[in-house]
């Protein structure tokens, strides 16, 4: 397969991205998934060149150069970003990343990452962050994943994000940390999160339960 990446050039492109997000996140073609941050972001769309240029992936990036911009980030709605406010370098928030469930080609994420890398280099970005979603709100379903993350990938204290959302599950509540199935944990990790971890990323010490998106 071959993919073509496009940066949204107008409101129609952004609307197309929002409708795709709605289909993936909300399982609806009638609701437009949008928020106030959309107008501040750069939007990317990826198309399948050999399938009539079908839209298969969208995501958005938000460039952050000061504390006020950080406070306007999507992550700030759900996490206390006190530690990130101490970072003086330019940052980038990656968000609303979604892929057509019928496409499991790793080339899609690689295509996206190529664009992100160029943006990072151009803007001298030193820190990337964003939310990655587990499908559904069942904690039990992902206990192996959470134990795996707790044992290997919790962010250093200087980057830790504090609880802000009303409904969360804290990894400190996990018991028998060494009793989990590694194969199952890796299988159930969101592909995008796995990609971040392979690049050296970390996770917070809790997950947010979002009943709006059912994640």
Q: Where are the language model's segments positioned?
A:
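Short amphipathic alpha-helix that is part of the acyltransferase structural core
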Residues: 1-56
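Acyl-donor binding region in acyl/amide transferases
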Residues: 64-201, 207-215
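Active-site ExK catalytic segment of metal-dependent nucleases
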Residues: 58-64
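A structural microfeature
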Residues: 56-57, 205
């Amino acid at each position: 397969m071959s993919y073509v990446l496009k940066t949204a050039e107008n409101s129609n492109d952004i609307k197309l991205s929002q409708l795709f997000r709605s289909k993936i996140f909300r399982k609806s073609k009638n609701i437009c998934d949008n928020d106030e941050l959309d107008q501040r972001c750069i939007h990317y769309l990826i198309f399948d060149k050999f399938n009539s240029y079908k839209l298969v992936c969208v995501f958005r990036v938000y460039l952050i150069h000061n504390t006020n911009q950080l406070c306007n980030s999507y992550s700030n709605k759900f996490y206390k970003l006190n530690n990130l406010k101490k970072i003086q370098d330019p940052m980038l928030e990656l968000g609303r990343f979604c892929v057509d469930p019928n496409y499991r080609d790793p080339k899609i994420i690689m295509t996206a990452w190529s664009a992100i890398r160029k943006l990072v280099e151009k803007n001298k970005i030193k820190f990337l962050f964003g939310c990655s979603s587990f499908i559904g709100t069942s904690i039990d379903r992902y206990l192996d994943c959470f134990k795996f993350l707790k044992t290997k990938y919790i962010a250093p204290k200087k980057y830790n994000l504090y609880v802000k959302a009303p409904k969360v599950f804290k990894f400190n509540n996990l018991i028998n940390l060494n009793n989990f199935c590694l194969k199952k944990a890796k299988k159930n990790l969101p592909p995008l999160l796995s990609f971040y971890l392979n690049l050296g990323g970390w996770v917070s010490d809790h997950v947010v339960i979002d009943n709006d998106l059912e994640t």
